Design a protein with these regions (language model features):
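N-terminal export signals
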Residues: 1-18
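N-terminal pre-domain segments of enzymes
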Residues: 19-33
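Blade-edge beta-strand/turn elements of extracellular beta-propeller
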Residues: 29-50, 55-56, 114-128, 160-183
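N-terminal low-complexity or amphipathic/hydrophobic leaders
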Residues: 44-88
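Beta-rich, blade/repeat-based domains predominating
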Residues: 56-68, 130-142, 181-194
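Conserved beta-propeller blade signature
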Residues: 76-78, 145-146, 194-199
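Well-ordered mid-protein domain cores that form the structural environment of catalytic cofactors
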Residues: 83-173
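Extended, regular secondary-structure scaffolds
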Residues: 159-161, 185-186, 190-202
């Protein structure tokens, strides 16, 4: 994407995958953003360099994302910003802070509320701040977002839980110490057992 982060909805037919495998060959995108199979299309709904609903810049270094149904015919897309202090020196906007875990850390998460019919952004906002290097994450069966710091410096290297429907609350700034402090790559919750599976960066 030419070094720019973007959040996009990929839209396709509701048919089953062909038993011959896959959805077909990728078709080159004239816009140079993403190549998709026939009958698929995308729409960029948010992009680094644009502005949040608050007027602050959309932070960069987008990483893990998840979408969940919400009220009033909308979907909430939560995204990580895998930022560290050196990124802000090179021009990346930090995540705006209200109740940060660490005021010196530029990372965090934002959420985008999308209209299901028009597939357009209604608003976007910060859901957590003051973290380092958020990598992959997990949408939980109970509707929150577990997000992982791929970092191991003083006071960092934790998993945090974010509620996109109650942004920047105390939960979002409280590390889940029971999941350890190390360079977390990802977390996944088994919906049947409730067990959490953690991966780490070697």
């Amino acid at each position: 994407m030419g070094g720019l982060g973007a959040a996009a909805l990929v839209l396709g037919s509701n048919g089953l995958i062909s038993q011959r495998g896959g959805y077909g060959e990728l078709v080159a995108d004239p816009g140079g953003v993403i190549d998709l199979p026939p009958k698929f299309k995308y729409r960029i709904i948010s992009e680094e360099g644009s502005t949040l609903s608050s007027g602050a810049p959309v932070p960069g270094d987008h990483d893990g994302m998840a979408a969940s149904r919400s009220r009033g015919g909308t979907t909430i897309l939560v995204r990580n910003h895998e930022l560290r202090p050196s990124d802000t020196v090179t021009g990346n906007a930090p995540v705006p802070q209200k109740t940060p875990y660490d005021p010196a850390a530029p990372g965090g998460t934002t959420a985008i509320v999308v209209d299901n019919v028009g597939r357009r952004e209604i608003r976007d906002y910060v859901t957590s701040s003051g973290t380092l290097n958020y990598c992959a994450s997990e949408a939980t069966p109970w509707g929150t977002w577990l997000t992982c710091e791929e970092d191991r410096t003083t006071h960092h290297g934790y998993v945090f839980e974010v509620n996109p429907r109650d942004p920047q609350n105390n939960l979002s700034r409280t590390p889940i110490r029971g999941m350890g402090i190390f360079s977390h790559e990802a977390v996944d919750i088994d919906p049947r057992s409730g067990l959490a599976y953690l991966t780490l960066l070697p």
